[in-house]
Swiss-Prot record:
Enzyme class: ligase
Principal subcellular localization: cytoplasm
Subcellular compartments: Cytoplasm
Keyword set includes Transmembrane helix: no
Assigned GO CC terms: cytoplasm
Catalytic activity: a 3'-end 3'-phospho-ribonucleotide-RNA + ATP = a 3'-end 2',3'-cyclophospho-ribonucleotide-RNA + AMP + diphosphate
Superkingdom field: Bacteria
Native source species: Ectopseudomonas mendocina (strain ymp) (Pseudomonas mendocina)
Keyword entries, A-Z: ATP-binding, Cytoplasm, Ligase, Nucleotide-binding
InterPro entries per record: RNA3'-term_phos_cycl_insert, RNA3'_phos_cyclase_dom, RNA3'_phos_cyclase_dom_sf, RNA3'_term_phos_cyc, RNA3'_term_phos_cyc_type_1, RNA3'_term_phos_cycl-like_CS, RNA3'P_cycl/enolpyr_Trfase_a/b, RPTC_insert
UniProt name for this protein: RNA 3'-terminal phosphate cyclase
Length: 341
């Protein structure tokens, strides 16, 4: 194993730099040190979901890791061989299960055998992709690239209680390049409001706002009332399926935030993407970058250069010999192309 540590600054990009570095380190066998982890955040250092990602990555790659404590702002990680198998990881709070999935999946596609991974914690969190984003937007594109992976939601988990769980099954498989230039024509759209131990009028008001602002018909507006025991919780999901891509925009209901404001947050994201003409929005762009780098090539158009996309590009360049070219096609579209270096 290469013992020359890659040095990373975690002050920019938040936990995204750490997650990408863990994935890339396991894939390449290159160890890294990261300092100033989440230094600009209100709660700097490792939170429980970041620590779970680190300990999970260390377990599946037999890694030596130092700095693995809540609040730690420095970490070193030196991986061994990636080993498939049956794993179970508990975040212990409502920390995001989805972010742990996105850390582990790239490595498990290169494991020595199939894997089954159960993760418990939060499945619908502020500032993290909900389960449905993985299931309907991200993973279908990875499957088109050749990934053999299935994911199942076992139980919803809302902040702050958590208590959710998902299971992922991965068969080792190689990824092929993917090119996404335009989204294609829209062939379906669906707004879903999930509520648990929250007044029913919250879902009704969210959906009414979506229908009014996006001019979606009533049959495209759906409320789902979950078991009160897993609440309180509320999430609004806007799913837009096009020829090439399914996008999913979400907003998490929180105490003191009006239902109409929750709806507006998701609608604003959707409208920005719809009006841009780009193939993918900023979140899907950021999360496609590493799989395309693994595949050795590909391209997509997106709405703009986000902080996460920029920091992810920097991290990938430090681990892989890949050329990433970003071109401003017009004021609404950024084109990103990856090629073997």
């Amino acid at each position: 194993m290469n013992k020359d540590f890659i040095e990373l600054d975690g002050a920019i990009g938040g936990g995204q730099i750490l997650r990408s570095a863990l994935s890339l380190s396991m894939l390449t066998g290159k160890p890294f040190r990261i300092h100033n982890i989440r230094a600009k955040r209100s709660r700097p250092g490792l939170l429980r979901q970041h620590l779970t990602a680190v300990t999970a990555a260390a377990q599946i790659s037999s890694a030596d890791a130092e700095g693995t404590q809540i609040g730690s702002q420095s970490l070193s990680f030196a991986p061994g061989a990636i080993r498939g198998g049956d794993y179970e990881f508990a975040i212990g709070t409502a920390g995001s299960c989805s972010l742990v999935v996105q850390t582990l999946l790239p490595a498990l596609l290169h494991a020595d055998q199939p894997s089954r991974v159960r993760i418990s914690g939060g499945t619908h969190n502020p500032l993290a992709p909900p389960f449905e984003f993985l299931e309907r937007a991200w993973l279908p594109l990875l499957k088109r690239m050749g990934a053999q992976v299935e994911i199942e939601l076992l139980r919803h988990g809302f902040a702050p209680a958590g208590g959710g769980a998902l299971v992922m099954q991965v068969t080792p498989s190689a990824l092929r390049p993917l090119h996404l230039e335009t989204p294609g024509p829209i062939h379906s759209q669906q707004a879903t409001a999930l509520v648990a131990d929250v007044p029913g009028h919250v879902a009704e008001r969210e959906l009414a706002r979506v229908g009014k602002r996006l001019k979606w018909p009533e049959q495209a507006l759906k409320g789902i009332w979950l078991d009160k025991q897993i609440g309180p919780g509320n999430v609004l999901l806007l799913e837009i399926a096009c020829g090439e891509v399914t996008e999913l925009f979400s907003s998490i209901g929180q105490s003191g935030v009006r239902a109409e404001r929750v709806a507006d947050q998701a609608v604003d994201q959707a409208r920005q993407w719809l009006h841009s003409g780009a193939a993918v929005d900023e979140h899907l762009a950021d999360q496609l970058l590493l799989p395309l780098a693994m595949a050795g090539g590909g391209s997509f158009s997106t709405t703009h250069m986000s902080e996460h996309l920029s920091s992810n590009i920097q991290v990938i360049r430090q681990f892989l010999n890949v050329e990433i070219v970003c071109t401003q096609a017009n004021e609404r579209i950024l084109r990103v192309e990856l090629r073997q270096g």
